[in-house]
Amino acid sequence: MRKLVKNVLAMLIVGGTAVVMGNGTVSASNGIGINEQNFPDAQIRQIAAQYDSNKDQILDTSEQKKLTELIVIETTENTGVQGNVIRTAKGITSFKGVEYFAELKSISVGQSGKPQSSYKIASDLFQYTKQVKTIRVNYAYADPVDARYKDSDKQMLAKNTSIVIDDSMQCESLSLKGVQVQKMQIVSKKMKKLLIKTCNLPDEYTINTPNLQTLGLK
């Protein structure tokens, strides 16, 4: 018991305001600890750290509202995190943690320069983006960090991507390009725009979107 108390006290950071929840999440005054458990991917963790204004390793409720758009670019040059842009050669291992950004409305995952066939989108992309209204996957676009790369029709490959969207998500617009889909299940009254271009879809898939306004399958 004495050892347990010491371990808990060791987690009481920032003037004793942080507590350890039953699920291991570090929280302080409705804040979220910036750690490997809450943000498993180091690059997503860097994004969180950039919005930690007072550098206390905790995202408070106001800091959680600062990120509104996240861009992930697959590239082999000038990798790193800058602002709301992740430029990575290794992809994202997990999107866990982005659910804490309450005002995050748009996520784009794409490529710049020469695509890598080994690149793979984290399978939990849709699991942790329930608050996001616009999701774009595998789009080539002008790199906001490196101006040498311009918008083009190039596609990168993403294998075994599972797409599951239901009414628990806020997603209104989904755009896919050049994706090999292992599973697709879209059942949503909120979905208004669905664009699926040059994708390899599974033999069986479900799309039930009664309020859809725009559909593009080619």
For every predicted segment, state its role.
Residues D203:
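Alpha-helical polar/charged "hotspots" used for coordination or helix-helix interfaces
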Residues R2-L4, G22-S162, D167-Q182, K190-K192, ...:
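N-terminal capping/linker segments that flank leucine-rich repeat
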